[in-house]
Regions:
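Amphipathic alpha-helical interface segments within eukaryotic helical scaffold
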Residues: 65-110
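A surface-exposed beta-alpha-beta supersecondary segment
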Residues: 27-82
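Alpha-helical transmembrane segments of multi-pass membrane proteins
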Residues: 10-25, 84-99, 119-142, 158-174
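Generic structural motif
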Residues: 59, 89, 196-198
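Short C-terminal domain-edge/linker segments immediately following a structured domain
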Residues: 52-55, 86, 97, 115, ...
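Intrinsically disordered terminal tails
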Residues: 1-50, 105-116, 150, 154-159, ...
Length: 217
């Protein structure tokens, strides 16, 4: 797989992962809570779902949510998960912009390959930071919810967060490790061909040795 293809795949993976993190942050179906069986809880209207921003009651004829806006009394796992997920969503804007400008198909005026490489590395590091925030939040939240009240199953929002964090990790790793290195850029001048006026044939000798040879001819 060529470098351009790897970078494009890393960008697309990071973009889809960022969308997954946004969906997980905005929705409240992180965990499903119930003290009894699923059928019993639905009949008694005690089947609930909990997210970062609200706690809902779910039944066949009712879906009512209560906002979790009492910041001072909220558990630490909810407040920390909120902060990490919001930070991941915000960091997605500059990181994806950097990665997009580092793609080989995007050309900026008076831009060197070294500057493009540094931009790809910085964008990849920010995407890995997004992945770390998503992983910590989506792992800590269900553990905290289970300790606070009986956890029955995981919600769709939590799965979206897991998928988003995994895709961001994959995309960030590809952008950081597969975007080409400075060593390749440094080797480019030494691979040039020099031509002698007398022989007219290509010579791949280093510049200093080739010039010395032409001086003695």
């Amino acid at each position: 797989m060529s470098q351009s293809c790897r970078m494009f795949c890393g960008f697309m993976s990071s973009f889809v992962g960022w969308i997954g993190l946004i969906i997980a942050t905005a929705t409240n179906d992180w965990v499903i809570t119930c003290k009894y069986g699923m059928h019993t809880c639905k009949k008694m209207d005690e089947l609930g779902s909990k997210g970062l921003w609200a706690e809902c009651v779910v039944s066949t004829s009712l879906y009512h949510c209560t906002a979790l806006n009492q910041i001072l009394v909220l558990p630490a796992y909810i407040q920390t998960s909120r902060a990490l997920m919001v930070a991941a969503c915000i960091a997605g804007v500059p990181s994806l912009a950097l990665v997009m400008m580092a793609l080989p198909c995007v050309k900026l005026a008076n831009e060197t390959d070294e500057a493009k490489h540094k931009r790809a590395i910085l964008g990849g590091v920010l995407i890995l930071f997004m992945s770390l925030c998503g992983i910590v939040s989506t792992v800590w939240f269900p553990i905290g919810a289970h300790q606070e009240e009986h956890l029955m199953s995981f919600g769709l929002s939590l799965y979206a967060g897991w998928v988003g964090a995994a895709l961001c990790f994959l995309g960030g790793a590809m952008m950081t490790c597969c975007s080409g290195g400075g060593a390749e850029l440094q080797q480019q001048p030494h691979n040039r061909f020099y031509y002698s006026k007398h022989s007219g044939t290509a010579n791949s000798m280093p510049p200093a040795a080739n010039h010395a040879k032409n001086a003695h001819v």
